[in-house]
Design a protein with these regions (language model features):
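N-terminal/domain-start alpha-helical segments
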Residues: 1-120
């Protein structure tokens, strides 16, 4: 079973993401801050990370930058930031995909599966 780390400070959104992952046979953990997400990502073996950008403390851009120093797994940014400049910045920092909120849970799962397939 593939394992996904959800780094998301909004508990409702994290629950929606987790629920759809579970239904699609993924295991998942949730981190509510950037610092916690970095610690969990480095301490465990995840297959993919769903990363919010607007987090308390360290923002998602800095989390992505830090994780890319050591991890080679898919990172999908899931955020309310809809400006092209944010999308470009995220992709340039090493994100594999960029999804804006509100999102279709079915599209999220399709992108998770697609990103994982590219890393296999």
């Amino acid at each position: 079973m593939k394992k996904v780390l959800i780094i998301e400070d909004d508990p409702q959104i994290a629950k929606i993401e987790r629920d759809y992952l579970v239904v699609n046979d993924f295991d998942s953990d949730i981190a509510a801050t950037g610092d916690e997400g970095i610690r969990m990502a480095l301490a465990n073996q995840y297959d993919l990370i769903l990363l919010d950008l607007m987090l308390p403390g360290i923002d998602g851009f800095d989390v992505c930058r830090k994780l890319r120093e050591t991890l080679d797994i898919p990172i999908i940014m899931v955020t309310a930031k809809q400006e092209d400049i944010d999308t470009i910045k995220g992709l340039n920092l090493g994100a594999d995909d960029y999804i804006t909120k509100p999102f279709s849970p079915n599209v999220l799962i399709a992108r998770v599966k697609s990103s994982l397939a590219r890393y296999e």
